[in-house]
């Protein structure tokens, strides 16, 4: 906590004479949480955060191709690590965790014990995001891999039937103010949608009839979120990244359903321009 207090104090003292704009590229699942984090940072520093949200894999490819991003917050560790390996960014830090849940249409009888059978039912429309483009899809396919150990043949069956409704370059967008996952379920395009628990909670706020079913322990898959600062950006980019890693921002992330990552791991070191060792994350 002492490190976080030091960083918050230094952020307050480091307000530039002219406000700077930080270009944030971030996973779509972080939109609500990082919007609130950005508002807190803007109020503290006077700087502006210009954010673009979308599938982490697509954003990573855009940054790799030269997009003008300053900070990249991904729904996995692999994509920011790839940018670091390309020498396009600094170290990668884990700053939040999530879990996969099943968002289920209102009238479907299902619980954690019967979830796998329901997903395998040929009459049930099972949806995921798009693997490689969106880590949520990669995590969902990891669930399918785990299912193979429970029921031989399950992995192939689930992969073949899964409808990749989100996270692709041409995926349909919901109306303004709707979450894409809840929208697809409401429109009847998915009976069960494997997505982040935070996304499922947001969908349920829009339609309280939609169900959230926890994955059974043998199918459970966690998500780790990685943060990196793109080389060549303004000093305020590093300060904003440090704020995301602070306990103050951690409280905001927690309020949106995320679990803490390695918060405060690098704060004092960054103030002395000696970065802490990056966290080791799980590839998708």
Residue ranges with predicted function:
Residues 1-8:
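Sec-dependent signal peptide recognition
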Residues 14-19:
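N-terminal signal peptide c-region/cleavage motif recognized by signal peptidases
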Residues 20-67, 74-77, 81-85, 94-98, ...:
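Exported/periplasmic ABC-transporter solute-binding proteins
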Residues 90-91:
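Periplasmic N-terminal soluble interaction domains immediately after the signal peptide in Gram-negative
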């Amino acid at each position: 906590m002492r490190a976080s207090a030091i960083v918050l104090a230094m952020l307050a003292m480091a307000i530039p004479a002219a406000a700077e704009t930080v270009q944030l590229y971030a996973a779509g699942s972080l939109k609500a949480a990082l919007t609130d984090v950005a508002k807190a940072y803007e109020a503290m520093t006077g700087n502006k955060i210009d954010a673009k949200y979308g599938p982490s894999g697509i954003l990573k490819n855009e940054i790799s191709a030269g997009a003008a991003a300053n900070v990249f917050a991904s729904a996995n560790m692999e994509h920011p690590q790839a940018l670091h390996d390309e020498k396009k960014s600094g170290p990668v830090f884990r700053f939040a965790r999530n879990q996969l849940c099943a968002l289920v249409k209102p009238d479907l009888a299902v619980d954690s014990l019967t979830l796998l059978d329901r997903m395998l039912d040929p009459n049930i429309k099972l949806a995921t995001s798009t693997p490689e483009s969106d880590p949520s899809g990669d995590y969902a396919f990891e669930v399918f891999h785990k299912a193979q150990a429970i029921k031989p043949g399950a992995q192939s069956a689930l992969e073949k039937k899964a409808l990749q409704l989100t996270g692709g370059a041409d995926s349909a967008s919901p109306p303004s103010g709707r979450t894409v996952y809840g929208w697809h379920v409401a429109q009847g395009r998915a009976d069960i949608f494997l997505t982040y628990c935070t996304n499922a909670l947001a969908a349920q706020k829009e339609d309280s009839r939609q169900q959230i079913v926890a994955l059974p322990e043998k199918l459970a898959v966690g998500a780790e979120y990685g943060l990196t600062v793109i080389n060549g950006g303004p000093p305020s980019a590093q300060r904003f990244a440090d704020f995301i890693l602070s306990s103050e921002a951690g409280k905001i992330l927690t309020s949106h359903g995320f679990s803490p990552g390695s918060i405060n791991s690098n704060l004092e070191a960054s103030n002395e321009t000696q970065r802490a060792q990056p966290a080791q994350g799980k590839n998708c």
